[in-house]
Amino acid sequence: MVGHAATDVPPTMAVKIFSAGVAACVADIITFPLDTAKVRLQIQGECLTSSAFRYKGVLGTIITLAKTEGPVKLYSGLPAGLQRQISFASLRIGLYDTVQEFFTTGKEASLGSKISAGLTTGGVAVFIGQPTEVVKVRLQAQSHLHGPKPRYTGTYNAYRIIATTEGLTGLWKGTTPNLTRNVIINCTELVTYDLMKEALVKNKLLADDVPCHFVSAVVAGFCTTVLSSPVDVVKTRFVNSSPGQYTSVPNCAMMMLTREGPSAFFKGFVPSFLRLGSWNIIMFVCFEQLKRELMKSRQAMDCAT
């Protein structure tokens, strides 16, 4: 990411990867209930049993889940979520600057090099982290009160059952929509954040510090949610589906369109934005500060020796 103060030491690749992983895990822990609410809203419409609860809005979904299934249910799938951030966010965010430098031919990084870096790191991270995404979504989606009997008792039980009943390919189910979603998210999120931060710093509107990171993260979160929401909903439905429910990703999208209309593609938009916006703020602020502090500590240790 652009901008280092004169006294700052540019962070190493290892520092960036570590900082991205830690910052993403912190953000996930804080915002996970919003993500669970988003998943429940996105799959609403699939379960047509009379006993199924109807979720209304973000707060209503969170309250309903807490009352009917217990507050702990809001964090169902968190271990898989943290595994996902360690394997996924650490790479897509931590490697972004390094890959961007690879695509940069001139003195300054162009928009094309930023987009290429976002495409590359996002794509690589999806293939590595997809099994954690499948398990996370399925644990968040299953209810103990209505619909089909819960398929999994926990994170590692889910990995085992999916691998034994659906094969290893089951752990990579939904890779295509998730790849599309995360290419959009990675490019929009990182490129928008990078451009916004660069504009604020270069025009001397804000210094390269917490307020600048906060504003840049909010703008990046909104733009990302608008562009990624339709793909995100299809991805969630397809990943959570039972074997044979949908024949393909396009079939899933078409069934959503014919049964529920175009608005189905924006189900859970508000929790998506609240989650992604707040996640971006926490992650980027922690990421930037952690990078800076780690390099200061390293510099102090080098001076001491």
Curated annotation (Swiss-Prot):
Positions with a binding annotation for fatty acid 16:0: K56, K267
PTM comment, free text: May undergo sulfenylation upon cold exposure. May increase the sensitivity of UCP1 thermogenic function to the activation by noradrenaline probably through structural effects. May undergo ubiquitin-mediated proteasomal degradation.
Top-level taxon of the source organism: Eukaryota
The keyword NADP belongs to this UniProt entry's keyword annotation: no
UniProt GO BP: adaptive thermogenesis; brown fat cell differentiation; cellular response to cold; cellular response to fatty acid; cellular response to hormone stimulus; cellular response to reactive oxygen species; diet induced thermogenesis; mitochondrial transmembrane transport
Transmembrane segments: 11-32, 74-96, 115-131, 177-193, 211-230, 265-287
An MF annotation (GO) of this entry: transmembrane transporter activity
Chain positions with Cysteine sulfenic acid (-SOH) modification: C252
Keywords for the protein's UniProt record, in alphabetical order: Ion channel, Ion transport, Membrane, Mitochondrion, Mitochondrion inner membrane, Oxidation, Repeat, Transmembrane, Transmembrane helix, Transport
Alphabetical list of Gene3D superfamilies matching this protein: Mitochondrial carrier domain (1.50.40.10)
Catalytic activity reported: H(+)(in) = H(+)(out)
Subcellular localization, as worded in the UniProt entry: Mitochondrion inner membrane
Primary residence: mitochondrion
Membrane topology: Multi-pass membrane protein
Topology Mitochondrial intermembrane: residue spans: 1-10, 97-114, 194-210, 288-305
Regulation: Has no constitutive proton transporter activity and has to be activated by long-chain fatty acids/LCFAs. Inhibited by purine nucleotides. Both purine nucleotides and LCFAs bind the cytosolic side of the transporter and directly compete to activate or inhibit it. Activated by noradrenaline and reactive oxygen species. Despite lacking canonical translational encoding for selenocysteine, a small pool of the protein has been observed to selectively incorporate selenocysteine at 'Cys-252'.
Annotated InterPro entries: Mit_carrier, Mito_Metabolite_Transporter, Mitochondrial_sb/sol_carrier, Mt_carrier_dom_sf
Quaternary structure annotation from Swiss-Prot or TrEMBL: Most probably functions as a monomer. Binds one purine nucleotide per monomer. However, has also been suggested to function as a homodimer or a homotetramer. Tightly associates with cardiolipin in the mitochondrion inner membrane; may stabilize and regulate its activity.
Described purpose of this protein according to its UniProt entry: Mitochondrial protein responsible for thermogenic respiration, a specialized capacity of brown adipose tissue and beige fat that participates in non-shivering adaptive thermogenesis to temperature and diet variations and more generally to the regulation of energy balance. Functions as a long-chain fatty acid/LCFA and proton symporter, simultaneously transporting one LCFA and one proton through the inner mitochondrial membrane. However, LCFAs remaining associated with the transporter via their hydrophobic tails, it results in an apparent transport of protons activated by LCFAs.
Protein name in UniProt: Mitochondrial brown fat uncoupling protein 1
Record organism: Ovis aries
Lineage, broadest ranks: Eukaryota, Metazoa, Chordata, Craniata, Vertebrata
